Amino acid sequence: MEISMPPPQIYVEKTLAIIKPDIVDKEEEIQDIILRSGFTIVQRRKLRLSPEQCSNFYVEKYGKMFFPNLTAYMSSGPLVAMILARHKAISYWLELLGPNNSLVAKETHPDSLRAIYGTDDLRNALHGSNDFAAAEREIRFMFPEVIVEPIPIGQAAKDYLNLHIMPTLLEGLTELCKQKPADPLIWLADWLLKNNPNKPKLCHHPIVEEPY
């Protein structure tokens, strides 16, 4: 008897990764590990936070003994923030990082990133969002211009396609049959670009160069 299996579903998550100030010089090396681990680097920026900004970012740790040292450390130099995406991005990035305390990581998870690049409990080299809510908040903090939306999965993805993609695509294919262009693929691509219902309106602003 043949068993009909449902089609596989692809789940894509986003998480925030930070290369902390004391290992910024290892950025290229760490990005190579990230890419080889199946992540896509959706966005990346290098910036320096003020102590006040660091306090706002780590607001849930306010009042703890290490809080002043943490904000001083994180504002001591430029850091690199990245939005990472892949299947189970949040949990897999945390797994790559290893324990928060780099001294513990060196003993229990010697191949983890914090064991390799970190120094101790405070200077643990890298940051990763703990859960979906944290990832959403932290991405908005570091990338305020980014629209953080859940990526459609499973039935939600099918519903999205049927509602937002298929009507425009069918209209384009119908017009394609009427026009009968010499190069159908190029014609359809151009038509879809011109008739995209979600096409944004461009607003030109001066670009401010970051100091780092």
From Swiss-Prot:
Q: Name one GO cellular component term.
A: extracellular region
Q: Which UniProt keywords apply?
A: Cell projection, Ciliopathy, Cilium, Cytoplasm, Cytoskeleton, Developmental protein, Differentiation, Flagellum, Hydrolase, Primary ciliary dyskinesia, Spermatogenesis
Query: What compartments host this protein?
Result: Cell projection, Cilium; Cytoplasm, Cytoskeleton, Flagellum axoneme
Expression across tissues: Specifically expressed in testis germinal cells.
Lineage, top-rank taxon, reads Eukaryota
Q: Biological process GO annotation list?
A: cilium assembly; cilium movement; CTP biosynthetic process; epithelial cilium movement involved in extracellular fluid movement; establishment of localization in cell; GTP biosynthetic process; negative regulation of oxidative stress-induced intrinsic apoptotic signaling pathway; nucleoside metabolic process
SUPFAM superfamilies in the record: Nucleoside diphosphate kinase, NDK (SSF54919)
> Region (NDK) spans which residues?
13-145
The family database entries (CDD domains) matched by this protein are listed as: DD_NDKH5-like, NDPk5
Give GO MF terms, alphabetically: 3'-5' exonuclease activity; nucleoside diphosphate kinase activity
Q: Does the keyword Hydrolase apply?
A: yes
Primary residence: other
Q: Name one Pfam family in it.
A: NDK
Q: What is this enzyme's EC?
A: 3.1.-.-
InterPro entries from the xrefs? Answer: Dpy-30_motif (IPR007858), NDK-like_dom (IPR034907), NDK-like_dom_sf (IPR036850), NDK_H5 (IPR012410), Nucleoside_diP_kinase (IPR001564)
Disease connection: Ciliary dyskinesia, primary, 48, without situs inversus: A form of primary ciliary dyskinesia, a disorder characterized by abnormalities of motile cilia. Respiratory infections leading to chronic inflammation and bronchiectasis are recurrent, due to defects in the respiratory cilia. CILD48 is an autosomal recessive form. No situs abnormalities have been observed.
Its annotated function is as follows: Functions as part of axonemal radial spoke complexes that play an important part in the motility of sperm and cilia. Does not seem to have nucleoside diphosphate kinase (NDPK) activity. Confers protection from cell death by BAX and alters the cellular levels of several antioxidant enzymes including GPX5. May play a role in spermiogenesis by increasing the ability of late-stage spermatids to eliminate reactive oxygen species. Exhibits a 3'-5' exonuclease activity with a preference for single-stranded DNA, suggesting roles in DNA proofreading and repair.
Family, according to the entry, reads as follows:
Belongs to the NDK family.
Assembly: Component of the axonemal radial spoke complex 1 (RS1), at least composed of spoke head proteins RSPH1, RSPH3, RSPH9 and the cilia-specific component RSPH4A or sperm-specific component RSPH6A, spoke stalk proteins RSPH14, DNAJB13, DYDC1, ROPN1L and NME5, and the anchor protein IQUB. Interacts with IQUB.
Free-text note regarding domains: Does not possess all residues considered to be crucial for the NDPK activity.
What protein am I looking at?
Nucleoside diphosphate kinase homolog 5
Organism listed in the record = Homo sapiens
